[in-house]
């Protein structure tokens, strides 16, 4: 992808890639929610909004195929690619101006009703902007952070913002400002390409400049431009910027919410949160207002699923650092960011449990709540393969990791205390150790003998029987070996010949094949009937062969 795309260029690229639906008829703002809900798997560009100068783009980062496209990789590798890119840094560059300065409104001219405001979900507290990348500097260090936060309309120049998660850096900045008796200067950037959003969600230490990380994702310095009324820099490809004063000295004392969240429910109810004063609005002429789809009847196909690759990256990176041989991490869309799978190659019997502990606690998102770990023979991107491994490789009393009182998102309605949750990990790997027979977990692959040899010499049933007896007499044979040897002969002759020899054959105790050998008894080893037990599927003793 080109570095630092403008939003119009990004829209064109999505259209060319087949990810975009265009709505060319003019619609009212109140029709926007149902229009978006009717197109859950595509980005939607509504070109004309009645009585509004903005067009609307939404659902533009709503599924894992889009993330893979933006990261130029396979969807199974987005987490790994994010970890790799997050290691890079590039110092940002300042430019004098940018398209987001084509329209500048300050002071009394600020009017948020210029935006295409609408009630997204029935019980929302008010209209929200939610494709908001909040940008601020730490009051003590000057280090930049940006992150995505929901923000509710209050008046033409006021908003509320949800910062109830204690680990989020914008909240940390606000509290640091309040401790100094100051408010916090914040820029809200609305509209930008997927790569910018992915970069904003990467887990990095608090002393890391997020725009140096953005440059690492670009592979080139991010270009930044100064705001008009506050001492904050914003990316030069911003479409719309709201320059704000976050009233940190007032505390979290203003109503915000409820809001239809990524859970598909109204998590968190009405909250106490911060108030923002909007000091300036700047944007491009013929602007596109980007909205983040969230909740609704298809919560697994919304822009808030951007958390998925972020969680995958956090988990993949933590597992690698801990020495776990991790191959892939997946946060499935239907798990709404709260479920994650890892495919690993265990080197020791404790690797799976150690991996689960890391998966449940390492992400700055406070997610997932449920983690599962699988062997490398399980395709974690195939839901049926995942369920099959859970069904027969997971034993609840031995393979469960339970951790109480962990951080999570405050929108989880099941939490008795907001932001605090118990978490569970399930070890769905094959057991290791002397007490386990790995052969019992071999998958039952279908037989494919291929084409018979072209120079096959037809045999009678008696000839097959004589040759089969000699073949088994040379060394014990599995039935598959016998079928391969006689492949192309009439199957009735093969089975008939074997039946004529059956009284001369016994079975070896050599798992997993339990081969046939010449013997005067059914078990060609010292075998005594054993009590039925699920721990010994063979139901026989393990005496010498």
Sequence positions of predicted segments:
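Extended, highly charged
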Residues: 1-275, 279-488, 492-494
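Non-catalytic nucleic-acid substrate-recognition regions in nucleic-acid-modifying enzymes
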Residues: 483-544
């Amino acid at each position: 992808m080109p570095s630092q795309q403008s939003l119009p260029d990004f829209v064109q690229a999505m259209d060319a890639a087949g990810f975009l639906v265009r709505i060319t008829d003019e619609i009212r703002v109140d029709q926007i929610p149902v229009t978006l809900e009717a197109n859950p798997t595509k980005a939607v560009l509504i070109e004309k909004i009645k009585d509004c100068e903005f067009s609307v783009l939404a659902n533009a980062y709503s599924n894992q195929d889009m993330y893979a496209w933006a990261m130029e990789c396979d969807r199974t590798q987005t987490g790994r690619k994010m970890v790799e890119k997050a290691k890079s840094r590039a110092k940002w560059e300042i430019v004098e101006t940018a398209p987001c300065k084509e329209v500048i409104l300050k002071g009394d001219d600020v009017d948020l009703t210029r935006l295409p405001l609408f009630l997204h979900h029935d019980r929302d507290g008010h209209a929200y902007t939610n494709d908001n990348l909040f940008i601020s500097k730490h009051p003590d260090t000057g280090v930049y952070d940006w992150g995505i936060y929901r923000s509710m309309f209050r008046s033409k120049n006021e908003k509320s913002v949800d910062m109830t998660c204690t680990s989020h850096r914008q909240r940390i900045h606000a509290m640091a400002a309040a401790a100094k008796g100051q408010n916090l200067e914040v820029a809200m950037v609305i509209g930008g390409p997927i790569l910018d959003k992915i970069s904003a969600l990467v887990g990095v230490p608090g002393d890391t400049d997020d725009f140096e990380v953005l440059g690492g994702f670009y592979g080139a310095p991010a270009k930044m431009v100064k705001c008009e009324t506050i001492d904050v820099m914003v990316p030069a490809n911003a479409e719309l910027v709201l320059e704000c004063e976050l009233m940190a000295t007032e505390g979290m004392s203003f109503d915000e919410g409820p809001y239809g969240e990524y859970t598909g429910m109204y998590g968190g109810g009405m909250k106490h949160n911060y108030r923002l004063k909007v000091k300036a609005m700047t944007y491009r002429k013929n602007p596109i207002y980007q909205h983040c789809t969230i909740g609704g009847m298809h919560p697994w196909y919304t822009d808030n699923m951007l958390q998925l690759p972020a969680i995958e990256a956090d988990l993949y990176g933590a597992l690698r650092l801990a020495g776990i041989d991790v191959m892939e991490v997946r946060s499935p869309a239907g798990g709404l960011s709260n479920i994650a799978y890892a495919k690993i190659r265990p080197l020791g019997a404790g690797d799976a449990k150690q991996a689960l502990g890391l998966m449940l606690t390492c992400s700055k998102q406070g997610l997932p709540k449920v983690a599962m770990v699988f062997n490398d023979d399980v395709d974690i991107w195939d839901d049926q393969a995942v369920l099959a491994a859970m069904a027969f490789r997971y034993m609840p009393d031995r393979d469960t990791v339970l951790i109480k009182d962990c951080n999570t998102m405050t929108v989880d309605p099941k939490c008795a205390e907001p932001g605090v949750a118990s978490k569970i990990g399930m070890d769905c790997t094959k057991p290791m150790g002397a007490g386990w027979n790995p052969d019992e977990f071999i998958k039952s692959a279908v037989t494919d003998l291929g084409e018979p040899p072209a120079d096959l010499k037809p045999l009678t049933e008696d000839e097959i029987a004589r040759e089969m007896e000699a073949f088994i007499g040379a060394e014990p044979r599995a039935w598959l070996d016998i079928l391969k040897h006689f492949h192309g002969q009439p199957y009735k002759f093969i089975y008939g010949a074997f039946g004529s020899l059956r009284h001369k054959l016994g079975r070896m105790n050599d798992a997993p094949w339990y081969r046939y050998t010449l013997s005067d008894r059914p078990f060609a080893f010292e075998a005594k009937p054993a009590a039925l037990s699920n721990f010994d599927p063979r139901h026989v003793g393990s005496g010498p062969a």
